[in-house]
Curated annotation (Swiss-Prot):
Organism: Lawsonia intracellularis (strain PHE/MN1-00)
Domain of life the protein comes from: Bacteria
NCBIfam families the record matches: PRK05610.1, uS17_bact
Keyword tRNA-binding in annotation: no
SUPFAM superfamilies associated with the record: Nucleic acid-binding proteins
Subunit architecture: Part of the 30S ribosomal subunit.
UniProt KW keywords: Ribonucleoprotein, Ribosomal protein, RNA-binding, rRNA-binding
Entry protein name: Small ribosomal subunit protein uS17
One GO CC term on file: cytosolic small ribosomal subunit
Amino acid sequence: MPQIIAKCNGRVLVGTVISDKNDKTIIVHVETLVKHPLLKKFIRHRKKFTAHDPLNECSIGDTVKIIEFRPLSRNKRWHLVAILEKAV
């Protein structure tokens, strides 16, 4: 990965790749747990992020780390940092 990514101070998320059909683009599914202030129970928040994969090295099911970056297109504002676990 380029050095410019390592210096970026954006948010870092970990998620699972659910689509890699587009060229140099992946869609990452991120799930977070948030505690409800009144009910005191944990609620799952799920969101999809479109991320830039410059080397087309991800496949469906991989666990990846993405970082917030400058806008690359209308929907792409995230960049692939590392593949934490390859899919079987």
